[in-house]
């Protein structure tokens, strides 16, 4: 039987650039891989609510500094790290006018990149696929 975990994955845009975060060596999974802003959805929590919480926690931008541009259909992604596990990903695209990011312990670096440059980064599984569903 496959176990599934519901998560949000958010991308922030600033002008023509997309924010990528490098996961720190202190997180449980996908250490030192580049990712969007993500987090596990708690019980009956709405995905959009979790998305905004994660954006504030991971990059320090509050509701006033972000605007929802698009949400995509839920995606199922098989986890290469765990047997019989999949991620149910709820993708969101937000924009911000503020490129100043305040990282918490979950991430060690950030880069504002052009969409086409995502292939140059060692990312969490299917990150490009999730991003392209939002564009």
Region locations from a protein language model:
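A short coil-to-beta-strand element that immediately follows conserved catalytic motifs
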Residues: 62-72
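Active-site-adjacent beta-strand/loop module that shapes the phosphate/pyrophosphate-binding cleft
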Residues: 5, 14-16, 72-100, 111
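NUDIX/MutT-family hydrolases
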Residues: 91-93, 102-131
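Conserved N-terminal beta-strand and adjoining loop/helix that marks the start
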Residues: 1-19, 37-40, 93
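Conserved Nudix-box catalytic region and its N-terminal flanking loop in Nudix hydrolases
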Residues: 17-57
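Functional cleft and adjacent loop/helix regions within the main domain
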Residues: 34-37, 43, 79-84, 93, ...
């Amino acid at each position: 039987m496959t176990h599934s975990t519901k998560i949000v994955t958010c991308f922030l845009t600033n002008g023509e650039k997309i924010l990528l975060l490098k996961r720190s060596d202190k997180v449980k999974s996908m250490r030192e891989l580049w990712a969007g802003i993500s987090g596990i959805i708690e019980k009956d929590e709405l995905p959009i609510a979790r998305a905004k919480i994660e954006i504030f926690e991971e990059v320090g931008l509050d509701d006033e500094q972000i605007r929802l541009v698009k949400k995509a259909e839920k995606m199922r992604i098989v986890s290469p790290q765990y047997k019989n596990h999949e991620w149910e990903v709820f993708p969101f695209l937000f924009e911000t006018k503020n490129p100043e990011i305040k990282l918490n312990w979950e991430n060690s670096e950030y880069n504002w990149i052009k969409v086409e440059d995502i292939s140059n980064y060692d990312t969490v599984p299917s990150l490009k696929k999730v991003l392209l569903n939002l564009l």
